[in-house]
Amino acid sequence: MIAAVASVVAVLPWLIDGGPSIRYAIDIDVYRAGAAALLDGDNLYTRGYEVGGITLPFTYPPLAAMLFIPLALVPYAVALVTWTLASVLLLWWCLVIVLRHAAPRLADHRMIATWILPFALVAEPVRETIGFGQINILL
């Protein structure tokens, strides 16, 4: 029963928001391109990177390019799924932390965060961050 209710709670906001859509996560491809350039010994900042039919600069510090190297070593789909799962997990963890501080008397912060997570995922800033493959949640 609990699993059924949790499933409805998880899917309902997504359906209200328009249902499934696959979007090209352009930002993650910029991160991957910068990391690949670093691996090739190229200057990160003297060129643009062709992603999604446009040219974008790498605007992050060199340390970021080093941290993005694992993304450059795997196919786009693997990088995207890994990045998205990490973002969702960290968003959940942020919800747990906020609940612990905002409502310390609640019995199970992790379970409540799990119930809140689907609603947080369809909030415009979070939905767009994940849709574009941005780094915001991971920071």
Name each model feature, range by range.
Residues M66, V81-T82, A113-P118, L138:
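Hydrophobic alpha-helical transmembrane segments
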Residues R105-P125:
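Transmembrane and membrane-interface helices of multi-pass
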Residues M1-H109, E128:
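TM-lumen/periplasm interface segments of multi-pass membrane proteins
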Residues P125-L139:
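Multi-pass, polyprenyl lipid-linked donor-dependent membrane glycosyltransferases
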